[in-house]
Amino acid sequence: MNAIFDNYRLLDTLSHEDEADFRVFLQDPDNLEDGLMAVAGLTLNLLENHWSEHKLMTILTSCDGIAPEMFERIVVGVMLIMMRYDREIRHNQTLLEDLQEVLTFAPELSFTALSNIARTTQIKRMEQFNRQLTQELMPLMNDRHSNEFYDIIRSRQSEMEHIAKMHLDQNFLIFREFYSTPFFRNDASNWLLPWNDKALLNVKEEDRDDVAGLLDLWPLCDSDKYALCQMYDSFKGVIKSQLSVDSLKEVGLDMPKNQIVTNGYVQQLYRFFRLSSHTQIRPFDLAYHLRDLMVYRLIVVGERAKESIDQLLA
């Protein structure tokens, strides 16, 4: 249990003391995890409860001089908050100016974060594709050399290429069943923990080098890393049979590092809201209406940017 996360997630009103502590957590260079969990907790507080301009302004005015990882969490969280409270925000000109100042401080980061939020709209399409492909191939699994087996693969080739090209979250399909452990079931904060190598101690000693090697090559979000450590012993046969070092290198090298980091936090939040029993809201469903929201207008500037985001929402 992370006391800082729980405190900021569950508090009703943000007192002056809470606000001062929040800023201290974000400014402490020696304890990055406390700041990251404070940001996650206050973000969830806003998303899961009622609108509070004071809480949002506390987040927005705490950005100066903080670590890049913390700022990335703030940008992603602020975008989801803007989506959730679009009606309250869109006519508040002063607040919109403050939001724009934060979101345009690092425009490439903000555009990448919004792109990754838009990209989540394709996950259900990807799930449907996988279900259909499995249903079609299952009767032929004992005869993989049949013409019919390869005809089906060829007929689905364009969709497979689309999934690869769009950098869709294929790891979600792999790891969604890994989140049933007590580690996630009993503690909401574990879904949003930053990665700590100490988690490798949960892996059998003879498997630790293998898991560490996978983590070095596989661009997983932090909660997927924890899930892998929790469940590796049960699934290592499947993992070893399906993955190769070359394929993992290709996936990792194909995406810029800043996109992997930002996308990782988007994926952590997506897993929390989609898979966790600790929450009842689904803020990522609002991404289907992204073009109608103020966050889209603030971030998507120019035809090329519009075309890029709209392609993800198609």
Regions found by a protein language model. Give the residues of each.
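Amphipathic alpha-helical elements of HEAT/ARM-like alpha-solenoid repeat scaffolds that form extended
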Residues: A3-L10, G35-T43, E72-M79, L109-R119
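N-terminal uDENN/longin-like adaptor modules and analogous extended polar/low-complexity scaffolding regions
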Residues: M1-P29
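Structural recognition of alpha-solenoid helical scaffolds
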Residues: L14-F22, D34, A38, W51-T58, ...
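C-terminal regulatory domains involved in ligand/effector binding and gene-expression control
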Residues: Q128, E148, S155, H162-Y179, ...
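Long, charge-dense low-complexity segments
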Residues: L60-A67, F71, V75-M79, N142, ...
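Alpha-solenoid helical-repeat scaffolds
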Residues: A199-A314
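Alpha-helical protein-protein interaction scaffolds
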Residues: Q27-E97, A314
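Eukaryote-biased recognition of long, low-complexity, charge-rich segments
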Residues: Y85-I163
